[in-house]
From Swiss-Prot:
Location relative to the cell: Spore membrane; Vacuole membrane
Keyword S-adenosyl-L-methionine set for record: no
Lineage: Eukaryota, Fungi, Dikarya, Ascomycota, Taphrinomycotina
Record protein name field: Meiotic drive suppressor wtf18
InterPro entries recorded: WTF
Gene: wtf18
Biological role: Acts as a suppressor component of the dual wtf meiotic drive system, and can suppress but not confer meiotic drive by compatible poisons. Wtf meiotic drive systems promote unequal transmission of alleles from the parental zygote to progeny spores by encoding a poison and an antidote from the same locus; the poison is trans-acting and forms toxic aggregates in all spores within an ascus, wherease the antidote is spore-specific and targets aggregates for degradation by the vacuole.
Alphabetical UniProt keywords: Membrane, Transmembrane, Transmembrane helix, Vacuole
Entry's Gene Ontology BP terms: meiotic drive
Quaternary structure, from the entry: Homomer. Interacts with other proteins that exhibit high sequence similarity.
Length: 371
């Protein structure tokens, strides 16, 4: 019987099998060249993978840890200079033991006569110092690494604390500055809207302060020169400046400063005139002179302040006003003296006419009477 077996594979499946026979495994790389003569020398894929990855991998330990450069430098120094490294360990250990010994000696020395002091000193010398020396010398690398790590962590922590503190303080300063600016703005607007009440309140406070200072001067508890400066120039100038700054809009700052300097100039002139008069008439300056000077400055300061507040720009117009007043006064004096002169001339003419009438003869008087 003939075998009528027919393959169930389609032509497409056969083509796929032919293709897969010649495909390359990308993970294992290219296949090595096959030599038919030396068929037994064909390397395996495992050998090829070992050649491609020469670094051995230990699945139990995982990837190798990165070495610490400080540890490597220390190991190199230890290998290259063993004697110096040994002396360094010994020196540091001796220094640590010496510090503990002298600390114990200073602390226990006052208690040397007592049993507790002797026992503590003996324990420190006999047990603590040897243990500390052995631990420091034998475990030098361990505790130095721990100390270095602790110092590093501490420095990083302190740096972070300083950074956070600086940022926090900057934020606090910013918030405080903004808050104060808003408060000043609100207060300034409120004071400007109620400047009449503010003027009266501060003027009353000013009067009370000046009277208190005058009372201290009179009572002898305050120096006259200090009282004069505090009660007149400083207080009047400061209050005048503050009140003008608050009560007058900011665009009149030039006018405010000009008025302030005018007030100070007037007060300086009063001081100079008062000093000159006191020097001319009384060389021995006593408390009465200071009281007169302080009272004059106080009255002038109040007058100029209220005059400026009621009529802004009055101080600027004051020189012209004073000049016009002086001119009017002198013109009035001139007119007065002219009127007095005219009156005197008329009186003289009247007397002259009376004298002329007395010189007429009697005959002429009879003729005139007949006519």
């Amino acid at each position: 019987m003939k075998n009528n077996y027919t393959s169930l594979k389609s032509p497409l499946d056969e083509e796929d099998e032919l293709k897969t026979d010649h495909e390359i495994d990308l993970e294992k790389g290219l296949l090595p060249e096959y030599n038919s003569e030396e068929e037994g020398t064909l390397p395996l894929y495992s050998d090829i993978s070992k050649l491609a990855n020469p670094v051995p991998e230990d699945s139990s330990t995982g990837p190798t840890e990165i070495a610490n450069p400080n540890v490597e430098r220390r190991q190199e120094f230890k290998d290259s200079h063993p004697n110096i490294y040994f002396l360094l360990r010994l020196l540091i250990s001796v220094l640590a033991v010496s510090v503990v010994f002298f600390t114990a000696w200073v602390c226990v020395n006052p208690l040397e006569k007592s049993i507790f002091g002797k026992v503590a000193f003996s324990v420190t010398i006999g047990i603590t110092c040897p243990i500390l020396f052995i631990a420091t010398f034998c475990f030098f690398e361990t505790w130095t690494q721990a100390v270095a790590q602790c110092i590093k962590v501490t420095v990083i922590f302190l740096a972070q604390c300083v950074k956070v503190t600086v940022i926090f303080l900057a934020q606090c300063v910013k918030v405080t500055a903004v808050f104060l600016a808003k408060c000043v703005k609100v207060i300034a607007v409120g004071l400007y809207n109620s400047k009449k009440d503010l003027v009266v309140t501060i003027w009353l406070a000013w009067v009370v302060i000046c009277f208190i200072l005058f009372g201290c001067v009179k009572d002898g508890r305050l120096n006259l020169n200090k009282a004069l400066i505090c009660s007149t120039c400083s207080i009047s100038a400061a209050l005048f400046f503050i009140l003008l700054l608050v009560c007058i809009p900011i665009w009149t700052l030039k006018h405010m400063l000009f008025g302030l300097f005018q007030v100070l100039g007037v007060q300086s002139c009063v001081v100079i005139v008062t000093k000159g008069l006191m020097y001319l008439f009384d060389k021995h300056i006593d408390a009465t002179g200071y009281e007169i000077e302080a009272s004059s400055l106080f009255v002038i300061g109040n007058f100029l302040f209220f005059y400026e507040m009621e009529r802004p720009g009055a101080l600027k117009r004051m020189p012209k006003f004073i000049g016009n007043g002086i001119a009017s006064f002198l013109g009035g004096l001139g007119n007065a003296f002219g009127g007095i002169g005219n009156a005197i001339g008329r009186i003289g003419n009247a007397f002259r006419g009376a004298n002329d009438n007395n010189d007429i003869p009697l005959g002429e008087m009879d003729v005139e009477s007949e006519v």
